[in-house]
Amino acid sequence: MSGKPVIHEFIVVEGRDDTTAINRSVIADTIETNGSALSQETIEKIRHAQELRGVIIFTDPDFPGEKIRKQIDSAVPGCKHAFINRQDALPKAGRGLGVEHASSANIREALENFHTSGAPTEKQFISKDILVHLGLLGGVGAKERREKIGNILKIGYTNGKQLQTRLESFAISEEQLVAACQKIMQEEENE
């Protein structure tokens, strides 16, 4: 017995090195996109996997990874999303950013804290005014706060334009957002 958790869903990753990292961390089947140019064949494979057992999209926390995530989510509704923090996806040496650099513990944590996109039963709406008031849009430190919010809420990093949509997509309530911001403010005061 390996002691590794078993993931029922198929995990969609970008490449072979990501599959290796997943296999060292959990027992799961993966589907590799092999780059950001998603073929129709890959989309069909993901669609079939979603129908069979469900899919968790687990791409790198960078622009190409986010592009792949959006393409899949658009073509195959109802997918689950796992996010790895940017700092956990940095290599020990050299350049790059990716799932393949994350520790087994970080990979397991990301897969345990997935979100499901789609139409939530009760649509959450958080106005831009609230996002500005919480220091997440415009102003000094907004980018850093958005990155921290993404880590706390396990929704990944988003830029200012994407934040409201991401919060709605994963049905994050205003109360959850405010609580996460209070945690960040507490950390900033303690620094």
Swiss-Prot record:
<dbReference type="InterPro" id="IPR034141">
    <property type="entry name" value="TOPRIM_RNase_M5-like"/>
</dbReference>
<dbReference type="InterPro" id="IPR025156">
    <property type="entry name" value="RNase_M5_C"/>
</dbReference>
<dbReference type="Pfam" id="PF01751">
    <property type="entry name" value="Toprim"/>
</dbReference>
<comment type="similarity">
    <text>Belongs to the ribonuclease M5 family.</text>
</comment>
<keyword id="KW-0479">Metal-binding</keyword>
<protein>
    <recommendedName>
        <fullName>Ribonuclease M5</fullName>
        <ecNumber>3.1.26.8</ecNumber>
    </recommendedName>
</protein>
<keyword id="KW-0699">rRNA-binding</keyword>
<keyword id="KW-0255">Endonuclease</keyword>
<keyword id="KW-0540">Nuclease</keyword>
<feature type="binding site">
    <location>
        <position position="14"/>
    </location>
    <ligand>
        <name>Mg(2+) 1</name>
    </ligand>
</feature>
<feature type="binding site">
    <location>
        <position position="62"/>
    </location>
    <ligand>
        <name>Mg(2+) 2</name>
    </ligand>
</feature>
<comment type="function">
    <text>Required for correct processing of both the 5' and 3' ends of 5S rRNA precursor. Cleaves both sides of a double-stranded region yielding mature 5S rRNA in one step.</text>
</comment>
<dbReference type="GO" id="GO:0019843">
    <property type="term" value="F:rRNA binding"/>
</dbReference>
<keyword id="KW-0694">RNA-binding</keyword>
<dbReference type="GO" id="GO:0006364">
    <property type="term" value="P:rRNA processing"/>
</dbReference>
<keyword id="KW-0963">Cytoplasm</keyword>
<dbReference type="GO" id="GO:0043822">
    <property type="term" value="F:ribonuclease M5 activity"/>
</dbReference>
<dbReference type="GO" id="GO:0046872">
    <property type="term" value="F:metal ion binding"/>
</dbReference>
<dbReference type="InterPro" id="IPR004466">
    <property type="entry name" value="RNase_M5"/>
</dbReference>
<feature type="domain" description="Toprim">
    <location>
        <begin position="8"/>
        <end position="91"/>
    </location>
</feature>
<keyword id="KW-0690">Ribosome biogenesis</keyword>
<feature type="binding site">
    <location>
        <position position="60"/>
    </location>
    <ligand>
        <name>Mg(2+) 1</name>
    </ligand>
</feature>
<dbReference type="InterPro" id="IPR006171">
    <property type="entry name" value="TOPRIM_dom"/>
</dbReference>
<feature type="binding site">
    <location>
        <position position="60"/>
    </location>
    <ligand>
        <name>Mg(2+) 2</name>
    </ligand>
</feature>
<keyword id="KW-0698">rRNA processing</keyword>
<keyword id="KW-0378">Hydrolase</keyword>
<dbReference type="GO" id="GO:0005737">
    <property type="term" value="C:cytoplasm"/>
</dbReference>
<keyword id="KW-0460">Magnesium</keyword>
<dbReference type="Pfam" id="PF13331">
    <property type="entry name" value="DUF4093"/>
</dbReference>
